[in-house]
Regions:
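C-terminal regulatory
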Residues: 1-98, 124-128
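A bilobed periplasmic-binding-protein/Venus flytrap-type ligand-binding module shared by bacterial periplasmic
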Residues: 98-108
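Short amphipathic alpha-helical coupling segments at ligand-binding clamshell hinges
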Residues: 107-121, 127
């Protein structure tokens, strides 16, 4: 188990001594702040080097599950029965903008309205 071997980070600066799994920068980043673990708590002008890069969130989840290191995962990706634990819960990821786009002619559609309300409810319940 990764945390048994490397210990729990107690503060953001401790991430300097951990293996971080991030979204590979060779791919277009889906969210510009997705790799914020490389910078949070780091010395000014110093960015951590990732131990492992992956090109999708599910791959990051599998890498963490496999004990390769720590990653920033949205809570909806971690099943309730998972053996993964949240570290540094007092730290939140930077805010991310998200857009729900649909054709203008569908603006009065009941389906669009219901789906929009569903999305807003789910986003309000999710932590990143």
């Amino acid at each position: 188990d990764y945390l048994r071997e490397f210990g729990y980070p107690q503060q953001p600066e401790d991430l300097d001594h951990h293996r971080l799994i991030v979204y590979g920068e060779a791919q277009p980043l889906p969210v510009t702040t997705i790799n914020w673990l490389l910078e949070v708590g780091a010395q000014p002008g110093h960015q951590r080097r990732p131990a492992f890069t992956v090109n999708n969130l599910y791959g990051m989840y599998l890498a963490v599950q496999g004990g390769l290191g720590l990653a920033n995962l949205p809570d909806y990706m971690v099943p309730p029965d998972s053996n993964l634990v949240q570290v540094l819960p007092e730290i939140s990821s930077p805010p991310t903008q998200c857009y729900f786009v649909y054709p203008e002619e569908m603006r009065h559609s009941k389906r669009i309205e219901v789906f929009r309300e569903f999305l807003l409810r789910k986003v309000a319940e999710t932590q990143f």
